[in-house]
Amino acid sequence: MGRGRGVAIQETIEECRDTISDRIQYNLGLNESKVVLMDIVTGPNQNVSLQERTKRWMAVSVDARMTKFKKNFYPTNQKNSKNISKDLDPPIQRVDAHIVTPVAGKCGMPLQKFPEFKHDHEKIKIERDAKYVDYSVDEFDMSWMSIMNAKRTKLGLEIFSVAIYEHWVDRLEKMCIWKPKEFHKLKDENGEELDDVCNICLDGDTSNCNQIVYCDRCNLSVHQDCYGIPFIPEGCLECRRCGISPAGRVNCVLCPSTTGAFKQVDQKRWVHVLCVIWVDETHFGNTIFMENVQNVEKALHDRRALSCLLCKNRQNARMGACIQCSETKCTASFHVTCARDSGLVMRINETEDGQVNRFVWCPKHAPPLTDADREMRQLMLRNARRENERKGPMISMPTLMKSMISTICVERPFSDYSEIIYFWYEKRLNRLGAPLLKNFTQGASKSRRLLPKSTICGQLKNVETCEMKKQVNAVKESLASGLEIFDMIVRREERKKDMLNSYIRMFERGFKPTELLCQEVIEALKTIDAGKVFAEPVELVGYTDIIENPICLKDMSEKAASGKYSTVAALSADVQLMLSNCATFNKGNRVYIKYGNTYRKDSTPILEIAEKEEVERLALKTDEKFMTQLLNGVMVEYNGWAQSRNEVAKEIPPPTPSRGRGTGRRRQNPFLDVQELDTDDSKDSSALSEIPGSSKKSSRKRGIQDTKMEEDEEIKPSTSGTNAVASVPLLSSSRESKNKSKSSDADVSSPKSSWLGSPSTSQNLRRRVQGFSGNESSPKVHKKLSTDNPSNSNLRQTTLTNFFGTNPKTQQQVTFADMTATPSGSGNKNVSQRSLFDTPSTSKASSFTSLSSTRPSTRSTSIIPTINKKNAFRMSSASIQSPLPTTKKIGVRAMATDDEEEDIVIQPPPKEMTTQELEAEKLKSAENEAMSKFAHNQLVIVDGRAAKVIESRLAHLASDIHHEQRQSMMKKRREVLSEIPQAAVIYVEFFQKSNTLENFQWVTPDKVELLDLNNIGQRSPKIPGLKAAKEWHQKVLNGEDV
């Protein structure tokens, strides 16, 4: 009988006379104890029929039945052992017989669960191992014994017998300590350990029923499903190659590679599991255990004419079976393993009906690499590193101890046992350490069970080695802690640098000189001079005769550097003079006159905003309260126009964004890191209501960052001077000049980016600044901080003096009156005054808006002034477009602006971007803009199928959408938003009608692509539903009812 079934008493089945007693004991919980003995009572009269015996049995009472069926229990549960009668007989230490399954249907009640009674197999194995010998001699052993016995006979020594040799080799195999070869984990360039990947699928993901297992000999790592190991065996686990041919090298019949996961075709041939999967003719007969490879001969015959283009050894190019490039009419062929080792693009796609399609492309026809392809290439390199380790001989020799040899001598004494031990060791060495007993399970016997790791280390390694290992581990830990401390120091210094830059920019706001502002204006004027007409002086013959006062942008830059411009109005006069000279000299030349008019139109808003900034700064300098708070380091809100630029108001992303989270992004203040005062909500709301144009409730912790462009605002071209700056070409040019200025020693951005903003935001900001001039009340976003009030000294606030290391308690407060009363040329000039009022040099005259190092916004900005957002992405179906509801924020701006618990965090400035990166960001911003503004009835492509967008509020206009469909639509939308709460979902209707479940679907914008019917002929793949989409679009254009 099999394992766990016990030994049968007789050939006939013994009848169980009691089942109700077992049910009672099962309900009482006594079956948790181990049944040691069970006496089976058989009927005295075997001639009675089954029906008669059943009637007799049912007439017997329960107590009478229990007396006929005797059981002795050995309790293992302490709770149940208290309920057992003390009159039970002591457990009998013998094993007679047991019943695994009761005789159902013959007598008694059928049991739902019958406890299994098993032998103590461990004891039986130990007693058998003490006497039984599993090893049998082979021809090689007999040859060695015949040679050795001939020599020992001449010397008169004891000869070897087969029984002695088998006994000694058997005990040596079972008692030796055998440890598989240790393999260290792979590490990356930073020294971090990498997880192994499956040798077949190159995937490191695992699950509870599909783990990555390792061969104990060659350390081959494979998935259970990939290699066909449904159940992980106990003890030693070996791959098929190590189990059958551990010493000999095996070759794949389909490719020249000698490493990897092999399966056996027959007694002499082997194949890779990967080759069987990729070659169309071959497959596994048993897909669970991945065995019984079929059609190998057919594959070799059909593909004998193909040769590998990637084989380094050209002699192996014609061997095996090659696969071909998936590109049509391409005849390139290569082995499966050669293709993967060379990094070719190999993809496996599974359709909905379960069909698997495999594609591989040669280097000439390789498609663009995706993120999955790049990740697969990295995993392939990691697997190649592990393959190189397995190319060497996997020798793992066993270890013997003197106590083991003494035990064998007692069992089977022999005078010259050292010869047997040497021959056994050489035989194991010839097999690369593979055991001689194949069917002996590791750990089945206590005598052969592997010792614990601590015991092995204590027996096999000396004390010096252990001490050295401890020292190495200590050094490793100290290096790891040092690296962590270094990272913390770097982060701390970066925060310090960011804080210092924010304080510097804050002071530049209040004390920026007019000369520096003029330099910024001139740099911006240079950027809009695309033709370089006004960049250099005119050197034409007769130019000075016509023009009395020639001037150009280069002359203006020199005058600004020498400080000749005291006001922006003087600079504006020179610009007007330059444009009038151009019109005078080029009279009759339409090209230059048109260029001059365009330049005048673009430069006028720039000069007007610069003049207003100058006026606003002068107004702020005369504000005693503002200047007092600024000098003492109190973080006050500055509503200047420069702060409201689009690049300043954009959200700065966190340095390490987390994927897959549904929380909204935090809008962070790039200027300040302030812990605001706890003010009353009613006061905040009343203060906010005083700000012109503020209709939304804002957070108290937002500070000055609430100035932003609304989601539904349009970017309109500038038509007059009051419309601020809408000349969007300056934005891109300012970015380029910003990148150039970053090479200087100042850690701030270009001056040109300090006063570029959207028209709407600049108007709002001008309205806010008017309060400082006395016309309106100043905004009360923060509680007033008075230096006269002693209670304010206990409030938490971030001061500049704290950052520079001085004690705020002992520091003397600087007032605006003291600053103005102190002579500028006195010797005891205040330190803060010297650091604030010194005019920076020209080389360091970068803009204070370097914090605005921008990131691309989903609300893309037009590049040409005459193009607005409304027609920037106009497609073929633009005649039926209608905007999405403005209540749903999309993209970066969809964030919780009223979150009271968020803290303002200073982020480091983003990295410097090249011109190519800027262009890529513009394109990406345009794509995001297109994806975030899908209109009702917009033609799109979703997963390769033609569809149209259905806006939820306009779904009733579609004739084919009934009330139940709209209810289902909103229900599915809630389900999708629960999974992807941050993404904007779009409801689409597919034109290809397959069934009712697939006609309508909620999708995310990243899966949607705009369908342009004008250029659809250039698309090579076929789009399902395209014909129906064209017909529907034509009906819309004709005004028909759809």
Swiss-Prot record:
Transmembrane stretches, start-end: none
Domain of life where this protein originates: Eukaryota
GO MF term (any one): zinc ion binding
Residues covered by region (Disordered): 647-864
Transcription is among the record's keywords: yes
Tissues where this protein is expressed: Widely expressed throughout embryonic development and into adulthood.
Localization of this protein: Nucleus
UniProt keyword list: Activator, Bromodomain, Metal-binding, Nucleus, Repeat, Transcription, Transcription regulation, Zinc, Zinc-finger
PHD-type zinc finger segments: 195-245, 306-366
Domain Bromo positions: 509-617
Main location: nucleus
Biased composition (Polar residues): 787-838
Consequence the record notes for mutating C330Y: In SY238; reduced activity
Ranges of Low complexity composition bias in the record: 746-762, 839-864
Zn finger residue spans: C2HC pre-PHD-type: 249-282
Gene Ontology biological process terms, A to Z: cell fate specification; maintenance of left/right asymmetry; positive regulation of gene expression; regulation of transcription by RNA polymerase II
Compositionally biased spans, kind Basic and acidic residues: 735-745
GO cellular component: MOZ/MORF histone acetyltransferase complex; nucleus
Function, as annotated: Required to initiate and then maintain lateralized gene expression in the ASE sensory neurons. Involved in determining cell fate in the ASE neurons. Essential protein required to maintain expression of homeotic genes egl-5 and mab-5. May play an analogous role to the trithorax Group (trxG) proteins. TrxG proteins form multiprotein complexes that are required to maintain the transcriptionally active state of homeotic genes throughout development. May act via a modification of chromatin.
Protein name: Protein lin-49
Organism: Caenorhabditis elegans
